[in-house]
């Protein structure tokens, strides 16, 4: 039998990649993750693999893995007495047969020594250089790092800003270098929200850059902690799957290890899910999970997993409350930082951010890890004229629906009644909208006289939030994969149902980076949501009208097909008007709006 008769080589390659994963030791988690991602991508690859070179078409497989598979195929052919020249594998073998038909001149040219491809080395103080050093400073954890974590650590090593500014025609930032690092297999991107993992080659490159330029990291950074305790890093300790009551039990923990994070050493077959948090767990000493204090300094965070989702447990007093304000929230063009500066003078820890949703949100920042999570308090601020405009152009309902997706328990809608605001003719609509926000949406409505009054209220509210959380533990969710924005809220609800039902001293919340990536206007949108937003870009199309159109024409293609099937332009202009005549008044499309939608989607 020849190797050609093997047919599709994919099953063999999948098996060999599994062997590589199993061969990785406990200190080779990153390499195991590379092989795992390559194996999963190969499983999903729908074309047969008839030669080794074809695996380069598979996402996550580069020359290194291809060469390893080629070597294994050569060994397999040798062990099974299969002629190697028939094997549809190594690309260099195929190249030999091609060379035989070349002319003598070409063969002479080929004999000249080929220039070796230069290894990629990031330029000093460039974006790629800074990203690698920032990730190394953070310890290159196997769980990966978020974009925000990397930028916070990397900014000082780069001469270019990590934030683009289209107003000054700076369309690219230093962060775009992450694509170069991924292309050179120095970093991996995975999951949603996205996390970035430094590969073994990337870590070696970062170490080389650090020593070449004599870069000195801060004494308390994760890299230094890992150097002091190489066998047990604070960031990469084992996640436990057990009952929550066992995790938070204080009286059984050794007193001489206060302030440390106790990792749990699971048995050979750990339970897949958490037990009921309300049930009594046995003494930790008699538990099948043995407490193992880490070596050297560590961080006071318990990491665990429930129902396939990782989470962290932050104890009371281990975190601080901060207020994030969207940097687009301004008092006037000449006072863009008014709210941040005014609150800073009142002793409030506040920071301007580009928030994905909401105008202000209260977050908790862990004192040791410096990671942040979104608390159950957020605020949408509207000046009276802005509120009137949002009602008129249908942004009001859309914004409220997006706020509901957060699953936040306490959403405040603050209306600033600035003097001299012209809302003539909108008084009734404003009153109705405020009452609907309070009664039907369940939001807290707060009315202030002006921006100064808003600042005073924010100061008092921040103090209230700090008192509320002074004795609460936080269960911070860190999901690896969220399919859409609905999953964000449903996952939070599932955790609350499991952990908060009998425990008033604990609250579940998402990590801030997850909040930022998932809840953006264009983040993780379904086709249906994108279709509805496309309809709402037309002036006069409210959320109710867009939903009514979507119920009659489920997809944009079906709507455009219906327009094309109209016999005349006049029929096309009246089609949506006639199709929605049986709908309630708020969901109907008038003749003028129907004509506008025809001009947008139907006119050829």
Curated annotation (Swiss-Prot):
The organism's place on the tree of life at top rank: Eukaryota
Cofactor: Mg(2+)
Region described as Disordered: spans on this chain: 268-290
PANTHER family the UniProt entry points to: CLASS II CROSSOVER JUNCTION ENDONUCLEASE MUS81, CROSSOVER JUNCTION ENDONUCLEASE MUS81
Subunit structure: Interacts with EME1.
Family as reported in the entry's similarity comment: Belongs to the XPF family.
Known function: Interacts with EME1 to form a DNA structure-specific endonuclease with substrate preference for branched DNA structures with a 5'-end at the branch nick. Typical substrates include 3'-flap structures, D-loops, replication forks and nicked Holliday junctions. May be required in mitosis for the processing of stalled or collapsed replication fork intermediates. May be required in meiosis for the repair of meiosis-specific double strand breaks subsequent to single-end invasion (SEI).
Protein name (database record): Crossover junction endonuclease MUS81
Lineage, broadest ranks: Eukaryota, Fungi, Dikarya, Ascomycota, Saccharomycotina
């Amino acid at each position: 039998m020849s190797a050609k008769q093997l047919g599709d080589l994919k099953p063999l390659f999948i098996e060999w990649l599994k062997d590589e994963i199993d061969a990785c030791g406990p200190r080779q988690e990153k390499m195991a993750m590379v092989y795992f991602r390559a194996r999963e991508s190969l499983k999903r690859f729908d074309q047969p693999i008839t030669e080794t070179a074809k695996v380069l078409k598979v996402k996550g497989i580069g020359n290194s893995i291809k060469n390893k598979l080629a070597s294994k195929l050569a060994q397999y052919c040798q062990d099974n007495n299969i002629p190697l020249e028939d094997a549809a594998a190594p690309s260099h073998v195929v190249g030999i047969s091609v060379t035989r038909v070349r002319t003598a001149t070409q063969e002479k040219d080929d004999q000249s020594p080929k220039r070796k491809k230069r290894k990629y080395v990031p330029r000093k103080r460039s974006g790629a250089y800074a990203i690698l050093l920032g990730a190394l400073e953070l310890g290159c954890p196997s769980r990966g790092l978020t974009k925000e974590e990397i930028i916070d650590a990397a900014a000082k090593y780069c001469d270019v800003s990590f934030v683009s500014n289209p107003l000054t025609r700076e369309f690219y930032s230093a962060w775009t270098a992450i694509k170069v690092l991924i292309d050179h297999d120095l970093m991996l991107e995975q999951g949603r929200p996205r996390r970035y993992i430094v590969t073994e080659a990337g870590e070696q490159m970062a170490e080389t850059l650090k020593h070449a330029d004599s870069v000195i990291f801060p004494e308390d950074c994760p890299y230094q902690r890992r150097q002091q305790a190489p066998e047990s890093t604070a960031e990469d300790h084992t996640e436990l799957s057990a009952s929550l009551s066992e995790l938070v039990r204080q009286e059984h923990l050794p007193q001489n290890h206060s302030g440390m994070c106790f990792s749990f050493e699971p048995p050979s077959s750990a339970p897949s899910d958490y037990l009921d948090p309300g049930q009594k767990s046995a003494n930790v000493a008699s538990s099948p999970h043995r407490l193992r204090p880490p070596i050297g300094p560590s961080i006071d965070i318990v990491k665990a997993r429930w129902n396939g989702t990782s989470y962290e447990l932050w104890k009371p007093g281990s975190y601080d409350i901060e207020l994030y304000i969207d940097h687009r929230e301004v008092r006037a063009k000449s006072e863009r930082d008014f709210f941040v500066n005014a609150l800073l003078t009142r002793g409030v820890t506040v920071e301007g951010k580009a928030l994905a949703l909401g105008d202000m949100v209260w977050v908790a920042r862990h004192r040791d890890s410096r990671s942040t999570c979104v608390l159950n308090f957020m605020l949408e601020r509207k000046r009276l004229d802005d509120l009137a405009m949002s009602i008129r152009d249908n942004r009001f309902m859309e914004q409220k629906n997006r706020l509901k997706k957060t699953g936040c328990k306490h959403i405040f809608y603050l209306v600033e009644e600035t003097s001299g605001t012209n809302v003539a003719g909108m008084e009734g609509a404003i009153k109705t909208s405020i009452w609907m926000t309070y009664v039907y949406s369940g939001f807290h409505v707060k009315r202030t006289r002006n921006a100064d009054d808003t600042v005073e209220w924010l100061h008092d509210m921040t103090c209230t939030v700090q008192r509320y959380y002074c004795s609460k533990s936080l269960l911070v969710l860190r999901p690896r994969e969220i399919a859409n924005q609905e999953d964000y809220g449903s996952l939070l609800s599932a955790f609350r149902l499991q952990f908060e039902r009998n425990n008033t001293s604990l609250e579940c919340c998402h990590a801030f980076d997850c909040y930022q990536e998932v809840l953006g206007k264009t983040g993780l949108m379904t086709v249906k949501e994108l279709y509805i937003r496309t309809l709402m870009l037309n002036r006069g199309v409210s959320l109710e009208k867009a939903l009514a159109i979507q119920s009659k024409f489920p997809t944009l293609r079906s709507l455009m097909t219906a327009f094309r099937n109209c016999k005349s332009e006049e029929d096309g202009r009246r089609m949506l008007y006639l199709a929605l005549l049986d709908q309630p008044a708020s969901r109907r499309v008038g003749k003028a709006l129907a004509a506008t939608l025809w001009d947008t989607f139907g006119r050829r």
